[in-house]
Amino acid sequence: MTARIDAAFARCRAEGRAALVTYVMAGDPDPETSLKVLEALPKAGADIVEFGLPFTDPMADGPAIQAAGLRALKAGQDLRGTLALVRRFREGDDQTPVVLMGYYNPIHTYGVPHFLEDAQAAGIDGLIVVDLPPEEDEELCLPALEKGLAFIRLATPTTDEARLPAVLANTAGFVYYVSITGVTGTATPDFGRVSQAVSRITAHTNLPVVVGFGVKTGAHAAEIARGADGVVVGSALVDALARSLEPGDRAGSGTVEAVASLVRELAQGVRSAAKAPAGA
């Protein structure tokens, strides 16, 4: 199923631009609203969607995504329900890649073979599991690759030349460069250093390199897009959703549009930084 991811990057290259990768939490603030948000993302300009798996101990997530996960859990969202949302999304969209992002515990509890079967059937294209290092590839990474699911690794500012080959060894789909140290949504990246880091990674792999953590505005997205194959935005979208909620964390009449509006701004930023189209 990496074909959808490959096709998305190919389309962006043909247009001479980076891809916009958007993250939202599954089930936030409730499953039905979450599905509407998911459906709105590609229509607003997202090229790839990361769908977060709610978890009780999200160690790499900042306050915004932690709060989103708690709202989703309170609404009864679990891994089975998340796969069901993706199945429903696929009824109307068979083109946009969907990558599940989260932690290993819910997958382990579900059962790896069962999870991979159900993820493939639901139309999942890839996985980002932030707490499974390369040393544990046999747990999930290698079985996922055998099923045709991309297993996407994170590289960070502290990933040195000695560590990078291990990070890239079984990576598929794309490489996700975390532009800051710390948790999500807590700082703005140093754009100059990000470009240097992307160049360092691309010297070791032919995979697209996307950059996330700290991207909040269309201007930020444009800066990153000039030096990367893709721009990931998560906390800013989750924040936009949270600000739209009614008391009691209920979806408001403008909740879906609050997210879609920011995605349109981000998409415009990415497109404003367009490079020469591939082959031009």
UniProtKB/Swiss-Prot annotation:
GO: which molecular function terms? tryptophan synthase activity
Gene Ontology CC: one annotated term: cytosol
What name has this protein been given in UniProt? Tryptophan synthase alpha chain
**Organism per entry:** Methylorubrum extorquens (strain CM4 / NCIMB 13688)
Q: In which pathway does it act?
A: Amino-acid biosynthesis; L-tryptophan biosynthesis; L-tryptophan from chorismate: step 5/5
The taxonomy runs: Bacteria, Pseudomonadati, Pseudomonadota, Alphaproteobacteria, Hyphomicrobiales
Q: Which InterPro entries match?
A: Aldolase_TIM, RibuloseP-bd_barrel, Trp_synthase_suA
A UniProt-annotated Pfam family: Trp_syntA
**Key words of the record:** Amino-acid biosynthesis, Aromatic amino acid biosynthesis, Lyase, Tryptophan biosynthesis
EC identifiers of the protein:
4.2.1.20
